[in-house]
């Protein structure tokens, strides 16, 4: 993701009501073709820019999410979450609209050289929910990493699954493809979040899919085929998250105390 990654989704807000800092960075591009067993691409270690965003004066006041940061009794990556309406992320609404117009989850749709949607969904039958997460994560991770500039000629673009099948994409595009795949396999949208975060070890912006399951928050990451609990990834500092039900701004606990509502592969 490039420096204007967040600008694609976030409108310009007045600085007086700032809730959080958002961070920017980049990752290494990869070849266009999607080999059957390609490994996820490592991230490029580039400096991260910083920009402050604040809530618009006419927006609904930000309120802490119930039961910790997720509404599932889990403080995601140790944060407090402030919930906001989807209207504050018009780019995500555009993703939802484009995906509805170009669905890929029909039985005969060819996903790669050897797998149709019917075959992939058949492989998920009889598996535990956690095993399904592992299946979906590793399946989409076979696509190579490719930057938005190489794909679309612009620094920031969130691709829908139909576009990802043709061109692959970068970290948020993997997360989007996994989100909609799991939704088709029966996972409720409310139990999933696309999370935009800062990787404090690699010093870059990144995006993953988080799925809440059996009292845990599991991370599906294009950098690893290992699906693991969020608590093991202490280098991940979430900035905001989104699903079809709403958007959340995430702040570490100590920082949140000063904020009042309203205002490499493994």
Language-model regions: role of each:
Residues 2-6, 11-16, 25-266:
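A structural boundary/capping signal
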